[in-house]
Amino acid sequence: VRSTLTARRIAGVVCTIALLAGVAGVVAPAAPAVAPLAEAFEPTLSYFKCPPKSLPVGVQCAKLTVPLDWQNPSDGRTTTIDVRVKRSKEGKGGLTFNPGGPGGSGVEAFPGVYSLLPDDVVAKFDFVGWDPRGVGGSGLKLAGPAQPFVGLGLVPGGSGGAEISGTKPGSPAAKAGLVKGDIITKVSDRVMSNGADVVAEVRESVPGDSLVVEFLRGGASREVTVIVGSVDSGCQYGTVAPAYPPATGPVDWQVYWQQAADQIAAINTACLAANPDSAPYLGTWQVIRDLDALRAALGYSTWNYWGMSYGTRIGHAYARTFPNRLRAVVMDGSLPSAETTYGLATSFPANAWVSLQLFPALAAPAAARKMTVIEEYLNGTVVALPDGTELTRWDWAEQFRSLLGSQSQYPTAVAFVNNLYAGITAATPAERAKGLEVAAMISESQRALLEEQALEMAAVFVFVNCSDLHDRVTPSELAAASESIERNYGTARPYSMGLNAACFGLPPEDLSPAIPSGSSMIALKTPPVFVLSSGDT
């Protein structure tokens, strides 16, 4: 669940925090006793010299030492939380936040969010940023087992071979002489119909293997030997699921989700086995105890919390566990209080669909018809872009949804719609080529962004969600949901359930305890503020 930070929205929320700063305590029913820790642990906060040019000016940098496992806090195992603190003039207390995710970095977001705080908030409250476990400068990174690596980029789709879209400099493929535009026809005597065949062949190899690659260059057949290298996978996942469904035509969702579940389970199992001292300890149950340890280490009896998107799950769990530690809380883009893996996955396509309906109304009324034409066209055709890549309905759905995550990106979204529409409907070849050229640039930018997000956040996203929510979705349940979602929202929508349902192969008993949840009342001194806005994704 991604949080989008915009100046207007942040200004509105922090003005709410400023208002709360002056609210007399509204006394609710007596709060339940604070849940005791299993054993006492004295958190330590160690300050260090901040990197040059750190912002805002005067920020303090620190590491908080906490137990690896709050269920056994005195077993001697610890980890560290990366912290930033900007002290206030009046020192009335602290305000902390989480920007969303799971996987969002509070340290990275710290300067930008601080710059938008109202002056009265800055004057009264210390501002505190931190990276949750597994994120940024905090401990418990997920490192995957060594995976086979050749450094090939492949054009999606195809049927007469796998076209190379590029090679990573210095990679085994580059050293062997393969270049962009080569079309791989065989690997070790096996016929390659498309890029997926090549990926499967590489996955079956081990570092050090020799792969004999036959390919076409300028129509002439050639052959090279590629020595398979290795790379730390970092428990890396695809942008949503390991493989796309068919590029065109009807989708057998039962077959797709079973294949996806098998692939995801293999990744999850390997990642968990490779990280016995980190993967089981990433859940929000652990994070809220880190958060309360940070409060204690900074000397606040209570403090203020602002959660965005996934950060509201942290806020809800913290409030339910430590209600007497909160002075005021703002839930910005709140998740449900009683989440499930099934609910998280199946609600995502509907939420994305709502943003698709709001986009034309807010930014481009003429785009609605064009979007419909594009989706209908892509259901039957793969668009060949001028940069040598292809755009499928799955690419379009994910890339366009990414653009709608922030209204500041609406102009780019409008350009994507207009130019792709022109590329498939314009009257002349020149007009179509011009439209596809612009669409290709936008598509490549979004493709790179989604790949970067997957590399940086997907593993933490999966392990936090699967630790927090202990129900497990089956491929059959996803298939049944997909059929309904497809009828209501279009063929491309069910695919977006993937990462939110990616708990295959992760038994709850091997992970952190589930978050406290439920619909029972949480009694706080100051009533919480919930902030929602149209167009949230």
Which role fits each region the language model picked out?
Residues G238, P245, R369-L524:
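Alpha/beta-hydrolase fold active-site neighborhood
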Residues A143-G144, S233-G249, A317-T372, N418-L436, ...:
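A catalytic-pocket lid/entrance helix-loop region that shapes and gates access to the active site
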Residues Y300-Y310:
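Alpha/beta-hydrolase fold nucleophile elbow
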Residues L524, V529-L532:
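Short beta-strand/loop motif that positions the catalytic acidic residue
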Residues R2-C15, V27-G144, S233-Q258, I374, ...:
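Catalytic-loop region of hydrolases
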Residues P145-P148, E163, K175, V179, ...:
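PDZ-domain C-terminal substructure recognizer with occasional recognition of PDZ-binding tails
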Residues S309-I314, F322:
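Active-site loop->helix "elbow" adjoining a glycine-rich segment at hydrolase catalytic centers
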Residues I288-T302:
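Conserved acidic catalytic loop of the alpha/beta-hydrolase fold
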